[in-house]
A protein has these predicted regions:
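Bacterial N-terminal signal peptides that target proteins for export
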Residues: 1-8
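C-terminal motif of bacterial Sec signal peptides marking the signal peptidase cleavage site
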Residues: 16-19
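Beta-strand/loop edge motif enriched in small/polar residues
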Residues: 21-209
C-alpha cells in the first residue's frame, strides 16, 4: 500500500505540473545551449545519452529487455513527426528494459518534436507515439522531464499494436504507458503537455522510494 500511495502521489504531482501551461517551472528552453553532441537513432538503444546532447529519433526505438538507457540532464530527444512507413505510424519509444531520465530543475530532459512544429495548431496533433513500457520493464525513472506533442493514433504496424498493448484503429497513445504489474516507476517533477490522449496509463506497479 505504501508503494501504491507513493506512485499515486508522484502521478498527481506530474498532472498538477502539466496543468501549469506556459507558467511551468520546468522550461525546455533551458537546455537549448551548450549542446555537446547530436546523434540520430532508431532501433535498439541502450547505455547513456550524455548531458545536453540532441538525440534525433528517425524511427521506432526500443530499450531491449535486460538493458538500460540513462538520459542525463539537458538531453533533447526529438522525434520525427512524419511517422514510419506507408501508414505513417507514429514513432514510438518502447521500453522493454529499464529507463532512467535524470533531468534537473534548471536543465530538464525534453521529449518533443522539431522546434518549428511546436505550435498551437499542433497541440493535439499527436505527432509521436509516446513512451510505452512493456511488461518486461522493471524500472522507469522520469524526473525533471518534459514530454509533449504525443498521442498519435495506434495504427496497423505500430509496435504497441503488434505487441498487444493497444488495438490499432481504436486507441491513441498516452504520453506514458506502463504494463508490468511488478514494475517500479517514479514519475515526478515533470511536465506532460500538448498530448492528444491520456497523460499516464498505469497498469499497476510499485513506486521506487
Amino acid at each position: 500500500m505504501k508503494f501504491n500511495a507513493l506512485l499515486v502521489s508522484a502521478a498527481m504531482m506530474v498532472m498538477t505540473l502539466a496543468a501549469c501551461g506556459d507558467d511551468d517551472p520546468v522550461n525546455p528552453d533551458n537546455n537549448q545551449g551548450g549542446n555537446e553532441d547530436t546523434e540520430t537513432v532508431e532501433g535498439d538503444v541502450e547505455g547513456t545519452w550524455k548531458a545536453n546532447s540532441i538525440i534525433l529519433v528517425s524511427g521506432h526505438i526500443t530499450v531491449p529487455a535486460g538493458k538500460s538507457l540513462t538520459i542525463e540532464e539537458g538531453v533533447q530527444v526529438i522525434f520525427d513527426d512524419k511517422g514510419v512507413g506507408a501508414n505513417h505510424v507514429p514513432v514510438e519509444f518502447t521500453v522493454d528494459g529499464n529507463l532512467y531520465c535524470k533531468g534537473t530543475a534548471e536543465n530538464p530532459v525534453l521529449f518533443s518534436v522539431a522546434e518549428e512544429n511546436r505550435t498551437k495548431e499542433n497541440t493535439f496533433a499527436g505527432l509521436w507515439g509516446g513512451i510505452v513500457a512493456s511488461n518486461s520493464c522493471e524500472e522507469m525513472l522520469i524526473d525533471h522531464t518534459v514530454i509533449e506533442y504525443t498521442g498519435g493514433q495506434v495504427v496497423e504496424g505500430s509496435p504497441a499494436a503488434a505487441n498487444g498493448v493497444y488495438t490499432a484503429g481504436d486507441d491513441a497513445y498516452p504520453q506514458i504507458t506502463t504494463n508490468n504489474i511488478k514494475g517500479k516507476y517514479v514519475i515526478t517533477n515533470s511536465v506532460l503537455r500538448n498530448g492528444w490522449s491520456d497523460g499516464i496509463y498505469l497498469m499497476g506497479g510499485q513506486a521506487v522510494s
